[in-house]
Amino acid sequence: MKHIEKLPEPDFFINWKENFRHSNGREPTYKDFMGTDEWHNLRNILLNEQGFICCYCMKSVGDWDEDANDWDSHIEHFIPRNIGNIQPHSYRAQNVQLNYDNLFISCNGERCCKDHCGHYKKSEDSPMILSPTNPDVEEAFKYNPLDGEIIGTSAEAMTSARVLNLNTLELKRHRRTAIYYSELFDEDFEEKREQLIEFYSSRNEAGAYIPFCMAIVSVMKEWAV
């Protein structure tokens, strides 16, 4: 998982919510917001904020899926937007539907099946699930370079990997492939280690991270030549 540093809430989002309250006399819901011009703008803001990778598994996101006739990703509520129906008295149920700090972009899982990340997590909520905004989230997971397995280093990390189903065969294959082609196994890797870690930790000119970047970085930091 890649740490996400949330930017200030966009003015257009604040204004939309204020205008809705003034016009309708109630708090807006996510259903009210979905599909508006501001919703599309916010989606682009979140994609840029995350560097065009899934907030959970780090797959590339932001493209239109022709087969599904839909985007390859969705706006994700880290604390589920329907938690008020499930845990109405929980402090976590307060103002989550349109709380900017609770909004991310998650992939839709693999094509044809929502088998990991946001859609798999659904309405499950627990303080044991690590948020992408947690400053220590990158160190909470290790990766096996041989099979691509993600390994939680704490109870919270293990819970997160389970709830998000981050060890599907496809995700393990994606991570293993990304690590394999990362120059980790080059003869001169040790000479380039720090340079490569910096490269995979950084965005490209388009503002995007390389898919599965932190899996690569984590393995590179620990790899013994």
Language model segments and positions:
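A structural signal for short, well-ordered beta-strand segments and their strand-loop junctions
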Residues: 53-56, 74, 105-106, 140-143, ...
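Short Gly/Pro-enriched turn/cap motifs at secondary-structure boundaries
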Residues: 44-45, 94-97, 131
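C-terminal, charged low-complexity interaction regions
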Residues: 151-225
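A boundary/linker detector
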Residues: 1-40, 217-225
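Extracellular structured ligand-interaction cores
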Residues: 51, 70, 100-104, 136-140, ...
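Long, low-complexity, intrinsically disordered segments enriched in glycines and aromatic residues
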Residues: 114-169
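An N-terminal domain-cap segment
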Residues: 17-59, 63-70
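Histidine-centered nuclease catalytic patch
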Residues: 59-119
